[in-house]
Every structure is written in C-alpha cells, then in structure tokens.
Amino acid sequence: MIHPLAITMWDFSWIERRWDGAGFEDWNAALDGVKERGYDAVRIDAFPHLLSQAPEKEWLLLPVWYSNDWGSPYKVRVRLFPALIDFLKACRARRIKVALSSWFREDADNVRMALSTPQTMAKCWIDTLRLIADAGLMDTILYVDLCNEFPGDFWAPYFRNDPPWMTWSCWHTDAAMDYMRTAIALVRQEYPDLPYCFSFDGENTHFYRERDLSFFDLAEHHIWMTKLNKQQFYHEVGQAKDGRFTEEAYHLLADHALDVYHNKEDYWKQLLVDGIQTLAADAKAAGLPLATTECWGITDYKDFPMLPWDWVKDLCARGVERACQTGQWALMATSNFAAPQFCGMWRDVAWHQRLTTMIHEAPLPPEAEKTALGRTMRWE
C-alpha cells in the first residue's frame, strides 16, 4: 500500500547554487537533510535542451533574476553530464525519488528557442531519458513534467500560442493542447512506463473539466494564496514599478506584507482554502491525481530584513492540512522554500517533519493507482 509522497522543489538550484554557502555545494549533506525532514522526493530541472544538444559541454547560464534565491543571481558555468547522473545516484542511495522538469534556462546561445515544435521538445526529453536509462537509473524517476508552468513566457519563450498574448496559465488553447499532446505521445512511445504531464499555475482550474487531458498521468498545479483572486495580496502590498522579480518587490514586502496579512488573516487563509478545494474538485472531475510542488502561501520570499518566516510557515501548514483533507493529492510540497538556501525555513526540522507526516497519513487518490504514477511512487 502506498501513501502520498512529500516532495520538495529544487528547480535549477541543485546545479546552479554550488558555490560555498549556496546550499547545494554538498549534495550528500543536502539530501541527508531531505530524509531527515521526511521528504520522499525532489523535483529538479534536468536541462533537457542542453543535455540533448551537447551532454558534456560546459554551459554558460544567464541569470533569470537577481532578487530571488532560486538558482544563481549571476551568470554561472555548469557541466550537466555526468552531474545529473551523479545526483540521481545520490538520490537513489537514499531512496529519494526524483521528478524531472525544466524551466528551460537561458544559456549564452539561447538554445531553448529551438523547441518551437513538439517534435523538438520530445527529442530533447528522449535524449535526456536515454542518458538516465543508460546509467540504469530509471527506477529513480518519479514523473516527467515536460515544461514548468507551460506556456508562461519566462519558461516557454520558444512557444507561440494562438493568440500570442495568451502565455501564463493559458495552456487550454488548441495550439497549446496540440503541442502538449504531441510531445507527450512522442516521449511515451520511447519510454512508456513513466508518468508525464506539463505543469500549470493560475486560477482557471475549471479548464481541467473542460479540456481533455487524458494524455496526462497527473495534474501538477501550483497554487499560492498570494496569486489568488487576481493576485489581490500583491496588489494590497504594492506593485513594484520594475516588476515582481526585483529588489523593489522585496522592499515592498518588508514594509507592508505583515500588516496586510495580519489585518485580515482569516480572509487570506480562507482564500487559500477555497482555492485548494476548487483545484481538488476540478482535478477529480478530470480523473487526475494532483501533484503540487510550488505552494501554498507566498510565491516569492527569502531570508531578508523584516521578512520573518513564522506567518509563511503558518499559512503553508494550513494549506497542507486542507489539501490532505481533500484526498486528491498524490504528491505534495510544504512550500516553495523547502531547500537549504532558505535558512529560516529549512532549519525548522520539526516543522517539516510535522507536515511530511501529515502528508504521509493523508488518503491517496484512487486515480493515482490507475496511471503509471502508481508504479513510480513505489520502490521495487
């Protein structure tokens, strides 16, 4: 009998943040921390577009942002092979499953822009999975999310939707559906035993009911209180003139977030609960088990002056509790920040253990057993 798995998002940080003090300079220590806190799996960027192009090349990655603590705030050189294989071996040694995704990070040559067709998308994933299969590590893979938050233009600039302005959360168009369906079908032909999906975010979860996602094995959906009701929380905190992923945005959070939250704490918690219940019902109507690896309270946060972690942990705990009660989640994170670079969140071992235990004790959605996910959640 399997139970829901506790998973954490290590995105592209696992390979980019390897300088002294960045959190991932010692994979063994970081993964031991995963086990200590009760997590069963990590979700990482496999960089398939780069591995497919030249596995052993040293790539120069450009920063996607300077303010957040995911990834490198400056350009960084990485060699992905055999690093990915070494990381997977370290995970398997600890019986930690690995979900593969990609944020399609920009390198100096912008290789990702070649992925404009589902055929090129499929090829890069097939090539990456072949490297893993050749190393005898396929039993470590939990599922493959072909693109993070598709078709958001941060992560999928190569894809042109119809109409083109439909980017974030607009996976439901005919163009996006055709792209996803074809790409997954091609990868599945080569590796039929793995679960596949594209991950999404956004409030328009009713499209799970209205669009045919039977070619997915799971719905990976990201949900945060701060982005619900048309990002009401961020509007009340204040909008940074130069964009959300900036130091100005963190200054606004430091100045206003606590007051905005505590002035109507019950409202914000109920907003999250309502969003979770709606998402669970829509995924159930689609016949898909849920995975959420980015969640529940605030989207962007870090160790920073006047940004305490207590309210974030409290809100995330409420999200985990309510999601567990729905019985629709097969894979669940505790926050966006269960990683060693977020010291204020990571060091509270007891908090992680309490929430991962809650996840393990939740009911498993019956849909999980009907797909390949039910097999990959187990260790043989």
Regions found by a protein language model. Give the residues of each.
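Aromatic-lined substrate-binding rim segments of carbohydrate-active enzymes
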Residues: 23-107, 119, 130, 169-197, ...
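Structural preference for beta-strand elements that scaffold enzyme active sites
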Residues: 2-6, 41-43, 95-99, 139-145, ...
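Aromatic- and acidic-residue-enriched segments that line the glycan-binding/catalytic groove
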Residues: 54-68, 108-130, 156-165, 213-224, ...
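Boundary/entry segment of secreted carbohydrate-active catalytic domains
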Residues: 1-26, 34, 45-47
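Extracellular glycoside hydrolase catalytic/binding regions
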Residues: 136, 151-324
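Active-site groove signature of glycoside hydrolases
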Residues: 99-112, 126-171
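Aromatic-rich peripheral "rim/lid" segments of glycoside hydrolase catalytic domains that contact
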Residues: 59-66, 302-380
